[in-house]
């Protein structure tokens, strides 16, 4: 191979093969060589060419088909099939399944016969019973869901159709990460021959093979309106037989099938199926296989219903986990037409149901009835008694029927698919009432609580939920998992996660969980599932307890913060009240002050008083200054008037015109002499520091401004 070439980086090649398992190995090697081990360029190129291999578009060579992803082994070791080990891949609603989901290897067949598997026409095949999924608004050719059976009249042509098989192998002890359903994406619809229908027929390998039970599903675009009963029975084998691997084959066509009949089945399959048939005279044969994961090609207009038997007998709760060998399961997948609603059309005027169920077992097995009309109290009991024999425990049944009565209002309400776990209905009226509830809103699913009702033909009572499903919007994919005593796990989108009632945290918010009824446990069943259930319950309980502790601590912290915020709010309110009261008081004072404004006369009197007070203040100030300058000998009382010394010191007034007498002359001389004496005693004049006026040396204050001399 190309891995031996030294120019190829083995690490890059291994990474690309892990990321693009659907691309053949030689294409990956050529891409690595062309891009010189450039991981980004290789990823870009392989992303473009991946849809051609993934959806089987165009023509493929033998090498491409040989390297195509054909087998998915979930939990099966490599030496079980003796095939080449590859990376663990799966399809779970997307292109591949993560390695953490599926730990088993991917086995690639070495021969091209794995793809076509030609079958001999030695065993005649009867005309298949078909169930038409047709539109009520657009007159398009119907596309059917048929269930092939073995042991009828007529022969099928030996020509094998062009199918691309995908094998799903489930180990007995699969992990909890194993996917519960396998979605295979088909190409876009291409008109009338688009593969929108799937046919299921049994296929059992040789007794010496490692795989015990298988089923095949193939698409067919034609209608085969025949009235036959098809029942799937589980082998009443010992407990050791459950250790074998359970395999489901899902065929995805490369193009529209050219063969409209069901391919024949090997003689070993027919002989083993006929030998296990409890009703050989009815013209229908029974085969032994267990359907686990079946999906149609297109993602749109798909309704998948998966049923599982109860964990502990009839009426008890069953965990919807990944597939395990001790638990039997039936899966019915239907693909509707590309219209705004889904209907199950009646087939050729007969209401014989197509049953998929278990018979001859000591424990309860689910039974599926696909009927073109709702079961009634008159017809359901006889059919149930004929199809399913009485068992020690009740067998829950689920009906798929279409509300196609003429009195339903015609086009007022869209057709409704009614799924019920009990055939005891109140006639078509009850179905019409449920259908009227579901006629509103696109993709609306309504769940009714389970009610205890007698199970017809089972010899006991069964409590199971019933679901009314409408699909007016064709853009979504619905996966509905129904189990006795369990509400269905409904998920719009690609695939629904595993529904486990023990893990209450994974339930939706609006999910109403029904309490399981107490019944006698099955010792052989408990041995296989008890350790896993106990470990899962312990993990879920520990996780729940830790989550509760975390939420309580968070609640206490938030409560404490809330108390602090409340206290701060109260304090702020008190401060605001104080400030508002202070503002009100100030406003009142201001208003009162305006009322107390004095009059003009009062203002004049106050001004006079202020003037007198100012004079008194000045006098006292001058006296204090003189006392400080004159010293302790200064006596202000001896000065009658402080301003007397500040008289007129100008020139002497002129003498009178009369001649003076001697006395006057002598008095005048004496006065002149007196006046001249102080002039002789005068010193240097001093200048005032305030007004720079030259004052007499005898003055202690300025004559102009009365400023002190020594200040």
UniProtKB/Swiss-Prot annotation:
One GO process term, biological-process aspect: positive regulation of canonical NF-kappaB signal transduction
Written domain comment of the UniProt record: The RanBP2-type zinc finger (NZF) mediates binding to two consecutive 'Lys-63'-linked ubiquitins.
Any single GO CC term annotated in Swiss-Prot or TrEMBL for this entry: cytosol
Membrane topology: Peripheral membrane protein
Segments for region (Disordered): 118-142, 252-414
Residues forming coiled coils: 550-630
Polar residues compositional bias, start-end: 119-134, 252-261, 288-299
Protein name: TGF-beta-activated kinase 1 and MAP3K7-binding protein 2
Segments of skewed composition (Low complexity): 262-287, 312-353
UniProt cross-references to SMART domains, sorted A to Z: CUE (SM00546), ZnF_RBZ (SM00547)
PROSITE patterns: CUE (PS51140), ZF_RANBP2_1 (PS01358), ZF_RANBP2_2 (PS50199)
All residue ranges annotated as the CUE domain in the record: 8-51
Places the protein is found: Membrane; Cytoplasm, Cytosol
GO molecular function: K63-linked polyubiquitin modification-dependent protein binding; ubiquitin binding; zinc ion binding
Keywords: Coiled coil, Cytoplasm, Membrane, Metal-binding, Zinc, Zinc-finger
Keyword Lipid metabolism set for record: no
RanBP2-type zinc finger span: 681-711
Gene name linked to the record: tab2
Listed CDD domains: CUE_TAB2_TAB3
Record keyword RNA-binding present: no
Purpose of the protein: Adapter required to activate the JNK and NF-kappa-B signaling pathways through the specific recognition of 'Lys-63'-linked polyubiquitin chains by its RanBP2-type zinc finger (NZF). Acts as an adapter linking MAP3K7/TAK1 and TRAF6 to 'Lys-63'-linked polyubiquitin chains.
Lineage: Eukaryota, Metazoa, Chordata, Craniata, Vertebrata
Record InterPro entries: CUE (IPR003892), TAB2/3_CUE (IPR041911), Znf_RanBP2 (IPR001876), Znf_RanBP2_sf (IPR036443)
